[in-house]
Amino acid sequence: MEAFTIHTGRAVPLRRSDVDTDQIIPSEWLKRIERTGFGAGLFAQWRADDGFVLNEPAYAAASILLAGSDFGTGSSREHAVWALQDYGFRAVLSPRFADIFRGNALGNGLLPVQLSAETVEALTSAVEADPTIEITVDLVAREVRGAGLVATFDLDDFTRWRLMEGLDDVGLTLRHEDMITSFEAGRPAWSPTTA
């Protein structure tokens, strides 16, 4: 997992609330077994409309998604996170996230930043007025900066540390590989092993 400390990039204003995981990545994309290649399916039904914001050239290089409230509702679908990442997003800013989506995002290195509705609206309006505006998501300082605004956000220390170290569950476990190997070496030969 790629470490996340400070990210600066352009943003896409997605003026939609209650975006569920089926809208983020339609179910026909869930048959893939790899974790890459989902970017093409991101918001696939909406992207069929030429006027959809992700089709606008001004937002082509954006790496931050500004979303409405209740982003990521619906079924638990890690594919939704993988699609956002594969498309190039490093962070999603919203007034509220579905708990399961938030957990999947944090576990995969996509930073869901919960900000007040007023702050998200101000950033969205600024980006709509000038798509070249850059926003900084600073996990070290727990701040979002852009368009003359500075807003703080909450994230527990352990999750923040994991993201800054680039550690998913497997990476965190492998930090204790010596202890695991030692434990396995001391087990009776008739016991099941992890090898």
UniProtKB/Swiss-Prot annotation:
GO MF entries: 3-isopropylmalate dehydratase activity
Keywords: Amino-acid biosynthesis, Branched-chain amino acid biosynthesis, Leucine biosynthesis, Lyase
Domain of life: Bacteria
GO biological process terms on file: L-leucine biosynthetic process
Catalysed reactions listed for this entry: (2R,3S)-3-isopropylmalate = (2S)-2-isopropylmalate
Top-level enzyme category: lyase
Entries under PANTHER family matching the protein: 3-ISOPROPYLMALATE DEHYDRATASE SMALL SUBUNIT (PTHR43345:SF5), 3-ISOPROPYLMALATE DEHYDRATASE SMALL SUBUNIT 2-RELATED-RELATED (PTHR43345)
Name this protein carries in UniProt: 3-isopropylmalate dehydratase small subunit
EC number(s) stated in the UniProt entry for this protein: 4.2.1.33
The keyword Amino-acid biosynthesis appears for this protein: yes
Membrane-traversing stretches: none
Function: Catalyzes the isomerization between 2-isopropylmalate and 3-isopropylmalate, via the formation of 2-isopropylmaleate.
Quaternary assembly: Heterodimer of LeuC and LeuD.
Alphabetized InterPro entries for the sequence: 3-IsopropMal_deHydase_ssu, Aconitase/3IPM_dehydase_swvl, AconitaseA/IPMdHydase_ssu_swvl, IPMI_Swivel, LeuD
